[in-house]
């Protein structure tokens, strides 16, 4: 289970951030996926093409008839006039804005709303470490912490899971954090669950066995692993409460799933 502090309904400053698009969103209906990053959608009686930034397979979310929230985009050189920022799964709004988790964590760190990292006064973003970049480097004097953020959108039987597609980059980030922890450096990963439903977090070994292995190794060697359930509305995302972390779906107690 989680190697960090306790889980549950923590009291912290309210942290909300808007969608990256920064414009009013338009509702549309998903019709088909025409490429890894392209979708066709019905909007106001016409078909439109929209870009989706999330690299996951999204097979549970992007189903015919699903309600989408699109942001109009007019940047020069764009091939699509719209960006998919969220999708409804039943009544649960799920963010597909890949920039939102890092922006949420950055805001939470600035407000010291994450108790695990509240002692750090300096926050550096996108820190280069060899060939890779780590999302945050936190410091207070000589005390430092490397922090990586991952976006979670998929839920299986009430458990939020990651990844939604094989991620060699994700495994490399975990290996980097593991090496840092092995050398005495504090290191952590925070999984931001971009939806309001989910009672726990676990890696999905059926999608990426290597990532699941790397996560177990990271935890065993001192990398701290946290997961936060972060409700999404049409205006943005809010930092919610921490949920317990397990190293496999089968390890999640059935009584915990029944709380959903």
From Swiss-Prot:
InterPro entries attached to this UniProt entry: SfsA, SfsA_C, SfsA_N
A GO term, aspect molecular function: DNA binding
Entry-linked Pfam families: SfsA, SfsA_N
Similarity field: Belongs to the SfsA family.
Protein name: Sugar fermentation stimulation protein homolog
Protein's organism: Chloroflexus aggregans (strain MD-66 / DSM 9485)
């Amino acid at each position: 289970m989680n190697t960090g502090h306790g889980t549950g309904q923590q009291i912290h400053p309210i942290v909300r951030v808007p969608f990256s698009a920064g414009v009013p969103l338009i509702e549309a209906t998903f019709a088909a996926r025409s490429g890894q990053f392209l979708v066709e959608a019905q909007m106001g009686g016409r078909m439109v093409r929209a870009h989706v930034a999330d690299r996951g397979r999204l097979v549970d979310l992007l189903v015919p008839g699903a309600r989408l929230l699109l942001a109009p985009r007019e940047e020069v050189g764009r091939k699509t006039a719209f960006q998919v920022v969220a999708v409804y799964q039943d009544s649960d709004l799920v963010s597909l804005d890949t920039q939102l988790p890092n922006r949420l964590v950055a805001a939470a760190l600035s407000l010291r709303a994450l108790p695990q990292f509240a002692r750090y006064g300096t926050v550096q973003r996108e820190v280069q470490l060899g060939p890779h970049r780590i999302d945050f480097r936190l410091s207070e004097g000589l005390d430092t912490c490397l922090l990586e953020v991952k976006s979670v959108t998929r839920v299986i039987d009430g458990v939020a899971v990651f990844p939604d597609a094989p991620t060699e980059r994700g495994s490399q980030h975990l290996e980097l954090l593991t090496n840092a922890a092995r050398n005495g450096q504090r290191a952590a990963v925070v999984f931001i669950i971009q939806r309001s439903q989910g009672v726990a977090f676990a890696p999905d070994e059926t999608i990426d066995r290597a990532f699941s292995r790397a996560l177990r190794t990271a935890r065993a060697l001192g990398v701290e692993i946290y997961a936060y359930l972060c409700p999404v509305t049409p205006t943005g995302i809010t930092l919610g409460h921490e949920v317990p972390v397990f190293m496999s779906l089968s390890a999640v107690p059935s009584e915990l799933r029944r709380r959903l």
